[in-house]
From Swiss-Prot:
Entry-linked Pfam families: Toxin_cobra-type
Top-level taxonomic group: Eukaryota
InterPro entries: Snake_3FTx, Snake_toxin-like_sf, Toxin_cobra-type
Protein name: Sulmotoxin 2
Family assignment from sequence similarity: Belongs to the three-finger toxin family. Ancestral subfamily. Boigatoxin sub-subfamily.
Disulfide bonds: C24-C47, C27-C35, C41-C62, C66-C77, C78-C83
Subunit structure: Monomer.
Length: 86
């Protein structure tokens, strides 16, 4: 019984991070160059960066699911606070 209780405590401790919303940088194609402060996202969202192929802009934000890249774009999703800084 003690072993089960200890195992549950360890699992709960490891999952604590997933209970809190992430802080993600959020900016669009017009404001990407001054995206300097992370904002709180909804619980369960992940951070993302959407890059165009020639490096002229980057869209940053948070979403329930990772966005789909369009032609000449690429997407990077991440799962810890402020992970979409660069």
């Amino acid at each position: 019984m003690k072993t089960l209780l200890l195992a549950l405590a360890v699992v709960a401790f490891m999952c604590l991070d997933s209970v809190y919303p992430l802080n993600c940088f959020q900016c669009n194609r017009e404001t990407w160059w001054k995206c300097s402060e992370a904002k709180r996202c909804r619980l369960g969202n992940k951070c993302y960066n959407l890059y165009n192929s020639d490096g002229k802009w980057t869209v940053k934000g948070c979403a329930q699911t990772c966005p789909t890249a369009g032609p000449d774009e690429r997407v990077k999703c991440c799962y810890i606070s402020e992970c979409n800084r660069y």
